[in-house]
Every structure is written in C-alpha cells, then in structure tokens.
C-alpha cells in the first residue's frame, strides 16, 4: 500500500464546495478511479482549525501512482487549476508505505 497525505487551507465560505470536490464522490476520486490500482481516499477536517483539511489517498504501489500521474497529467492539472479558488494553499505532507498501523 502506498499513501499520499495532502493538507489544505480552505477559504472561508468554500468549505461545502471543497468537501464536495474532495469528498468520496468528488471530482478527484472520479479521476483517480480511472486507475485499477487506486484504492480510495479519506477526507478529514481538523476540528481545532476548521478551515484545515487533509486528504489521504491510497494506491496499491508507488509506481502505479506515478504511472497514473504520467498518464493523466493534463486532466490532473486541469482539475487542480479549476479548484484553486477554494483554497489559500495546499501541500503534500508526506507519501510512502506505512510500516504499521497504530490504534489509539
């Protein structure tokens, strides 16, 4: 399993639109679902900072994710540009293979 964690700072008033686009039936998931190695995404909202969101994307392998980016580069960039207006910033926090799960 390969995961990518993104952090977003959403503009006030854009929360609903952001959640729709980045949620389980949103445009990003629809794009990712074109690849058989995509396993799903989670959208998380920071309760301490309600304008901060995180997405976790799950892929079978890193090479599958990289291959997807190469094959769908223009569609990916087009989506990214079309939803820039919803956020102040976005950044990739980490990517990698989880060593183990920790349950608290």
Regions found by a protein language model. Give the residues of each.
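An amphipathic, aromatic/His-enriched active-site/gating alpha helix that lines ligand/cofactor pockets
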Residues: 23-40, 58-93
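Short coil/turn residues that cap or connect secondary-structure elements
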Residues: 10, 14, 30-33
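Short acidic/polar alpha-helix capping motifs at helix-coil junctions
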Residues: 4-8, 17-18, 93
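Short, low-order "capping/linker" segments at domain edges
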Residues: 96-104
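A general secondary-structure junction signal
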Residues: 45, 92-97
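Short, well-ordered beta-strand segments in beta-rich or mixed alpha/beta enzyme
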Residues: 2-9, 40-71
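Short, conserved charged micro-motifs
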Residues: 13-19, 64-67
């Amino acid at each position: 399993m390969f995961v990518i964690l993104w952090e977003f700072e959403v503009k006030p008033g854009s929360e609903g639109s952001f959640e729709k686009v980045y949620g389980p039936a949103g445009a990003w998931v629809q794009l990712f679902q074109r690849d058989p190695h995509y396993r799903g995404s989670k959208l998380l909202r920071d309760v301490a900072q309600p304008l901060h969101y995180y997405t976790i994307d799950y892929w079978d392998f890193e090479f599958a994710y990289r291959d997807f980016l190469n094959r769908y580069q223009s569609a990916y960039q087009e989506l990214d540009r079309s939803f820039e207006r919803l956020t102040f910033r976005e950044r990739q926090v980490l990517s990698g293979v989880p060593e183990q799960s920790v349950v608290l």
